[in-house]
């Protein structure tokens, strides 16, 4: 099958690239997705406590004012299920599914110099040819399954945050061991601890985290963000990481200790990533 463009992955980036290539550039485009649904990171990472650490009103597409204003987020930091629902909404809104094939993992991509084409093969023995190949696999979807001695002979249940099963897992009255305290580990531990008989966390490197101060979004906040669509979109292009808060140009040493503590305390109470933008 010959196409103008092939996109690998149906997450945030892949869906946007499909819209861009197909709807705006008029290219015959196909998305190849390993999973059985759109979502990318938010399809694979469905472990207990999984949610975004970026505020919902900016963790979304801004290319469409209609989509931005029609979707209503529930929380400051949305859960995995809410983000997945959002991406499914966008997929339906833009009629993207008809140009996505699921349950196909790209296993090779070779550039054929004489034909000036890419040859893309999947694990289902499908072969495609295209002029443009776009990788939208991201960096948070490939699970790193550690080679732990004895894991194959372990008699109990074990799970990986990046490949969490669809079925509901109960930790009630269970002795649980958790390995790792990265972003996923920090989110998983407090949820598991609520029902487990005991929870032991194995940590190699301590991480620093700030409080999220998560909360339900008020009608006033939702109304204000939608009315400020253009201003928010403009601000996102001018800040590191695309966040809707400005980074201070001042050094921490430009203030005395009393002033420094006041600035930090204010950011701490506000919660979230803006803490790192104080200085």
For each predicted feature, which ranges?
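N-terminal FAD-binding dinucleotide-binding subdomain shared by FAD-dependent oxidases/monooxygenases
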Residues: 1-5, 10-151, 167, 181, ...
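A short, basic/flexible loop-to-alpha-helix module at the beginning of a structural domain
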Residues: 1-3, 159-173
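Conserved beta-strand scaffold positions in the cores of enzyme catalytic domains, especially
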Residues: 100-101, 156-159
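Rossmann-like NAD(P)H-binding beta-loop-alpha module
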Residues: 174-196
């Amino acid at each position: 099958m010959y196409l103008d463009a092939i996109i690998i992955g149906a997450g945030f980036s892949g869906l946007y690239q499909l819209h861009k290539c197909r709807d705006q550039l008029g290219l015959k485009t196909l998305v190849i997705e390993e999973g059985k649904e759109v979502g990318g990171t938010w399809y694979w990472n469905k472990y207990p406590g999984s949610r975004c650490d970026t505020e919902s009103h900016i963790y979304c597409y801004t290319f469409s004012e209609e989509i931005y204003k029609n979707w209503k987020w529930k929380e400051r930091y949305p859960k995995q299920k809410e983000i997945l629902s959002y991406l499914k909404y966008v997929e339906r809104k833009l009629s993207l599914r008809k140009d996505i094939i699921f349950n196909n993992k790209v296993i090779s991509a070779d550039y054929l110099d004489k034909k000036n084409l890419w040859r893309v093969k999947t694990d289902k023995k499908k072969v495609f040819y295209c002029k443009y190949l776009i990788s939208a696999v991201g960096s948070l979807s490939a699970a790193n399954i550690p080679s732990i001695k004895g894991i194959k002979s372990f008699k109990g249940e074990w799970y990986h945050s990046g490949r969490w099963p669809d079925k509901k897992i109960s930790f009630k009255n269970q002795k649980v061991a958790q390995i790792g305290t990265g972003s996923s580990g920090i989110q998983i531990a407090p949820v598991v601890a609520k029902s487990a008989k005991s929870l032991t966390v194995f940590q190699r490197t301590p991480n620093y985290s700030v409080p999220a101060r998560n909360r339900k979004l008020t009608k006033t906040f939702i109304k204000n963000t939608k009315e400020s669509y253009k201003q928010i979109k403009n601000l996102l292009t001018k800040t590191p990481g695309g966040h809707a808060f400005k980074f201070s140009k001042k050094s921490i040493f430009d203030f005395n200790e009393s002033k420094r503590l006041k600035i930090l305390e204010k950011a701490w109470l506000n919660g979230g990533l803006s803490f790192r933008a104080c200085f």
